[in-house]
UniProtKB/Swiss-Prot annotation:
Transmembrane segments: none annotated. Forms a complex with CASK and CASKIN1. Component of the brain-specific heterotrimeric complex (LIN-10-LIN-2-LIN-7 complex) composed of at least APBA1, CASK, and LIN7, which associates with the motor protein KIF17 to transport vesicles along microtubules. Forms a heterotrimeric complex composed of MMP5, LIN7B and PATJ; the N-terminal L27 domain of PALS1 interacts with the L27 domain of PATJ and the C-terminal L27 domain of PALS1 interacts with the L27 domain of LIN7B. Forms a heterotrimeric complex with DLG1 and CASK via their L27 domains. SMART domains: L27, PDZ. It comes from Homo sapiens. This is Protein lin-7 homolog B. The lineage of its organism: Eukaryota, Metazoa, Chordata, Craniata, Vertebrata. The gene is LIN7B.
Length: 207
């Protein structure tokens, strides 16, 4: 069981770094071009995505040891998450409240179907739809810090059902893969329907 840790507040630290860069620019002690470039990086959406994923993993990874060990393990897990998303949209964190009406989205896929787990539908007017942030075509990477990559469909369902109060999802947007997966499933369903029809026709001819 992981030791209790204080939640990270990296957004505050990034803001302080930006303020420091602004002071350095005003002082004229360092080349302003380099300071401005670093400031743009810290204020970019990419940096925000890294910070959100790092904070979420830091708060939920089951790691014992010093703060330094925890930070190192979290950094490795964050790099792994972004490396896995290479060529796709970067991971992002979506937090939704857990209420009696459910989370308001459906998932499909899983190890048993030889595919990632995806958000296949965001229910109009549901919790996910009202809070925004989650899209059809998002691949589900983890639920409350537990990875569901390469896992059975049922594991993701169980994690979502077990969540209390709220649920933190790490997702990345890869709609093309979902479309390919749905096309493959539809092809399999069509093949089964044809097979059933042929079997029924064969029985009729014998009768």
């Amino acid at each position: 069981m992981a030791a209790l840790v204080e939640p990270l507040g990296l957004e505050r630290d990034v803001s302080r770094a930006v303020e420091l860069l602004e002071r350095l620019q005003r002082s004229g002690e360092l080349p302003p071009q380099k300071l401005q470039a670093l400031q743009r990086v810290l204020q970019s959406r990419f940096c925000s995505a890294i910070r959100e994923v790092y904070e979420q993993l830091y708060d939920t990874l089951d790691i014992t040891g010093s703060a330094e060990i925890r930070a190192h393990a979290t950094a490795k897990a964050t790099v792994a998450a972004f490396t896995a998303s290479e060529g796709h949209a970067h991971p992002r964190v979506v937090e939704l409240p857990k209420t009696d009406e459910g989370l308001g989205f459906n998932i499909m896929g899983g190890k048993e179907q030889n595919s990632p787990i995806y958000i296949s539908r965001v229910i109009p007017g549901g919790v996910a739809d009202r809070h925004g942030g989650l899209k059809r075509g998002d691949q589900l990477l983890s639920v409350n810090g537990v990875s569901v990559e390469g896992e059975q469909h049922e594991k993701a369902v169980e994690l979502l059902k077990a969540a209390q109060g709220s649920v933190k999802l790490v997702v990345r947007y890869t709609p093309r893969v979902l479309e390919e997966m749905e096309a493959r499933f539809e092809k399999m369903r069509s093949a089964r329907r044809r097979q059933q029809h042929q079997s029924y026709s064969s029985l009729e001819s014998r009768g």
